[in-house]
Amino acid sequence: MVQIIDGKALAQKMQAALAKKVESLKAEKGIVPGLVVILVGDNPASQVYVRNKERAALAAGFKSETVRLSDSVCQEELIELIEQYNQDDTIHGILVQLPLPHHINDKSIILAIDPKKDVDGFHPMNTGHLWSGRPNMVPCTPAGIMEMFRDYGIELEGKNAVIVGRSNIVGKPMAQLLLDKNATVTLTHSRTRQLAAICRRADILIVAIGQGHFITKDFVKEGAVVIDVGMNRDVNGRLIGDVAFDEVSELASMITPVPGGVGPMTITMLLEQTYQAALRRVSQ
């Protein structure tokens, strides 16, 4: 029988432990980890994500700020705001919610964030640390998946891991983290031929493509561990993943649900990296 990887329960456990660490840091050093989230425009999905992040940060005892800007804000104004938070010693983590309006260049905004406060792990300096095997700030979704592997005792060394989707946010950093644990990694994408056959070789299958129920049982070998990063809406507005959960569960040994799988862990790792940034600030 398939085992459900309960990301929501793990996230709650980790956030409770994190709240205690935050309380100790405040009592011993007088430091409260500070996180600012900048939201540009009124994208409904982004608004939900930002509210969830704000709620989790406050529950864990963080100083939490949310800045909401009109989608007409110019790139220079946004960079100027980021620079203000770069210089603010009470803020240890800066997150600019993506996607941004078309007139704002994502890369320029990411470059503007102090790498020490880049809790999303997207700054080239942090990706460089990741590729060189010395990760500091790591993109939160792959970091959360690695925590799930650890908590559930999922062996990675020597395993065939297939990642569907090569984004800078999930696919590429996920591949590097798995390589660091001595997995054999195949990174697939929209031009990959015979995708189903490749996926069927996977001991561990991680899917992040943004296409609802794209992965059916035809893509999965019996006993595989399946990690579903997708968040999509079906015709009835119901939240679904990239994996056809019911039919894939018949073959998989372990699987993450949507919702309640990877999503809560992404927020947890955002908070954990903000806390670690605050600790590094104290030790300077």
Swiss-Prot record:
Subunit structure: Homodimer.
Catalytic activity entry: (6R)-5,10-methylene-5,6,7,8-tetrahydrofolate + NADP(+) = (6R)-5,10-methenyltetrahydrofolate + NADPH; (6R)-5,10-methenyltetrahydrofolate + H2O = (6R)-10-formyltetrahydrofolate + H(+)
PANTHER family assigned to the protein according to its UniProt record, in alphabetical order: C-1-TETRAHYDROFOLATE SYNTHASE, CYTOPLASMIC, C-1-TETRAHYDROFOLATE SYNTHASE, CYTOPLASMIC-RELATED
Entry function: Catalyzes the oxidation of 5,10-methylenetetrahydrofolate to 5,10-methenyltetrahydrofolate and then the hydrolysis of 5,10-methenyltetrahydrofolate to 10-formyltetrahydrofolate.
EC number(s) given by UniProt: 1.5.1.5, 3.5.4.9
Taxonomic classification: Bacteria, Bacillati, Bacillota, Bacilli, Lactobacillales
GO molecular function: methenyltetrahydrofolate cyclohydrolase activity; methylenetetrahydrofolate dehydrogenase (NADP+) activity
Pathway(s) where this gene product acts: One-carbon metabolism; tetrahydrofolate interconversion
Database matches in HAMAP family: THF_DHG_CYH
Membership in a protein family: Belongs to the tetrahydrofolate dehydrogenase/cyclohydrolase family.
Protein name in the entry: Bifunctional protein FolD
Alphabetic keyword roster: Amino-acid biosynthesis, Histidine biosynthesis, Hydrolase, Methionine biosynthesis, Multifunctional enzyme, NADP, One-carbon metabolism, Oxidoreductase, Purine biosynthesis
UniProt-annotated binding residues for NADP(+): G165, R166, S167, S190
SUPFAM superfamilies per the UniProt record, alphabetical: Aminoacid dehydrogenase-like, N-terminal domain, NAD(P)-binding Rossmann-fold domains
Top-rank taxon: Bacteria
One GO location term (cellular component): cytosol
One Pfam family per UniProt: THF_DHG_CYH_C
Keyword Oxidoreductase assigned: yes
GO BP field: L-histidine biosynthetic process; methionine biosynthetic process; purine nucleotide biosynthetic process; tetrahydrofolate interconversion
